[in-house]
């Protein structure tokens, strides 16, 4: 049974849409069959086609219909736990490996957008505001870890006095700036991946 999600999201209202593709009838032969037209399926289909594999993607409803086309669109660097906590949990080498893996995933998204000229309203940079003074200690440690293991300039601390220049508000104790983060229109990105996959022969 397919759970039908409503089509009336902001993203659906502001996306361009794709030409209707033929419905699968009968049988088809391919090297790879990808099931699902979300980010993972689209990226997999595109990668397979770019490697010369005959690739078919099947989607029950429409491209980006599920979570891929409805998420917040944020590309937030790092993980959902501070680096020093991850080091305590898994050890230094594993923490570094996970951070680098997350960074490489984000870099792949940026590279796909650039390579295929995907117009998905991409904006660069992410700011994590410090609501409490003690947040700044966590942010400083996070910035040090990112700069040491992902390269200089991967993160920076914004002092409280400069917050207004970045986000137009005051009252915060400072912030953590990660230039490699950002925001995009997720459904436009999904449609761009689909267009690239179609052009590659999917």
Q: Model-found features: residue ranges?
A:
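N-terminal Rossmann-like FAD-binding beta1-loop-alpha1 element of flavoenzymes
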Residues: 28-57
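Dinucleotide-binding Rossmann-like beta1-alpha1 core, especially the glycine-rich loop
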Residues: 78-161
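Flexible hinge/switch segments at interdomain interfaces of large molecular machines
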Residues: 162-170
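Helical element adjacent to the flavin cofactor pocket in flavoenzyme catalytic cores
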Residues: 137, 144-147, 171-202
